[in-house]
Amino acid sequence: LHPGVNLIVGENAQGKTNLLESVFYLSTGKSFRTARNQELIRFGAEFADLSCTLFSGGREQSLRAVLFSGRRPRQLYIGGVKQRSAAGLSGVLTTVLFCPDDLLILKSGSSGRRKILDTALCQLRPGYAQALAEYQKLYDSKSRILKDYHDAPSLLEPLPEFNYRMAQVGAVVIAYRAKFLRELSKQARLYHAEFSGGREELSLVYQ
C-alpha cells in the first residue's frame, strides 16, 4: 500500500471488506465483524491463512495468522516466531477502524464504548493487553465456579483467591483506561473546539 491515502474500489462481493478485516485481524488478533473465528474461514475450507509484510519500528516485519475450521487453536506469528497470544501483536501494526455502526456508540450501552477503548489500548500498551486477557480469564473461571458449586461445594475454596487477584488485575485495567482517557480528552478537546468554532467544550470522563 502507498504510505499516503489508499482508495480500495471494487464491485460487490469482490472482497473489499475481507481485505480490511484481514488487516484489522493481523493488527489486533480479532475481527471487527464477528467474535467467532469460524466465520472468517471460507465455506467448505479447512483453514484461512492471513499474512502481510510491513515496516514497523524502522525495520521490516511479517505477520501471519492461521485459523482452523475445527477446534484446533489459531496460530499467530511475528517474523516467523509463534506467539503465545494476541497480546504479542500489540504495537506492530496499529490500525484505527471506523465503521458506520460506530456512530451508535453514544446512544448504545457502555459495552460498545469499552470495546473501542480496549481495541485502542491493546494496540498501544502491551501491558494492558496482558492485564485484560488475565482479567477475562479470571472472570470466566469465577463464573464457572459460581455456576457449578452447587454440585461440587469444594469449588468455592479458591474463590477468595480469585476475588483478590481479580481486584488486583482490575485495578491495573482501570488505571490504564483512566490515563488513556485523560490523554485522549486533551486532544479531543482541541479538535472539537476547532470544529465548533470555540462555541463548545468536549470532555471525556471514565467512570
Please give the residue ranges for each predicted region.
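Short hydrophobic/aromatic segments of transmembrane alpha-helices and their interfaces
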Residues: 22-23, 94-97, 163-164
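Nucleotide-state sensing region of NTPase/ATPase domains
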Residues: 27-112, 118-128, 185-193
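Short, conserved catalytic or interaction motifs in soluble domains
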Residues: 10, 28, 197
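Generic alpha-helix structural propensity
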Residues: 3, 14, 18, 35, ...
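A structural signal for short, well-ordered beta-strand segments
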Residues: 1, 52, 95-97, 142, ...
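Pre-Walker A-like glycine/lysine-rich segment at the N-terminus of P-loop NTPase domains
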Residues: 1-25
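An accessory alpha-helical subdomain
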Residues: 101-198, 202, 207
